[in-house]
Amino acid sequence: MKNIVDDKILLTQQKLEEIEKELEHLINVERVNVIQEIKDARSQGDLSENAEYDVAREKQGIIESRIRELETIISKAKIIKADLGSSRVSIGSKVSLENVESGEIQTFQIVSSIDADPFKSKISNFSPIAQALLGQHQGDEVEVDVNEKYSVRILEVINE
């Protein structure tokens, strides 16, 4: 996993809370439901040709696997915090930038790949644009190489 630093997984506080909520739901709702589905399927008799039993057991395996995955992420989570008050771009920063040539303005937050969600304007710290911006400051002009090179000007860096 690329977002492991010293065996820690980089997450925003918001993403950690989402993962904890998902884990709680899996344990308290999904796991309980699938156990009941298995009991119901067992009560139908012969398990060798019981498709409902097989489906429920497969579903249980998927749920248990996801629970273990989430527990591992939580146990290794390191909350990323932007450099408060700094104009330097870091993981967690919200950045507004302008394409120097087209004048197009984009705003997004740089997060870990686990947090990344382009539909919510959250990009991975491993994306080419984030790699070009990390460590730069408000007002800097930076060259980005995504299939072709272009320049952007950092208009604003918000670290909260």
Swiss-Prot record:
PROSITE patterns: GREAB_1, GREAB_2
InterPro entries to which the protein is assigned, alphabetical: GreA/GreB_C_sf, TF_GreA/GreB_CS, Tscrpt_elong_fac_GreA, Tscrpt_elong_fac_GreA/B, Tscrpt_elong_fac_GreA/B_C, Tscrpt_elong_fac_GreA/B_fam, Tscrpt_elong_fac_GreA/B_N, Tscrpt_elong_fac_GreA/B_N_sf
GO terms for biological process, alphabetical: DNA-templated transcription elongation; regulation of DNA-templated transcription elongation
Transcription regulation is among the record's keywords: yes
Coiled coil ranges: 3-84
Keywords: Coiled coil, DNA-binding, Transcription, Transcription regulation
GO MF annotation list: DNA binding; RNA polymerase binding
UniProt function note: Necessary for efficient RNA polymerase transcription elongation past template-encoded arresting sites. The arresting sites in DNA have the property of trapping a certain fraction of elongating RNA polymerases that pass through, resulting in locked ternary complexes. Cleavage of the nascent transcript by cleavage factors such as GreA or GreB allows the resumption of elongation from the new 3'terminus. GreA releases sequences of 2 to 3 nucleotides.
Family assignment from sequence similarity: Belongs to the GreA/GreB family.
Protein known as: Transcription elongation factor GreA
Organism whose genome encodes this protein: Mesomycoplasma hyopneumoniae (strain J / ATCC 25934 / NCTC 10110)
Primary gene name: greA
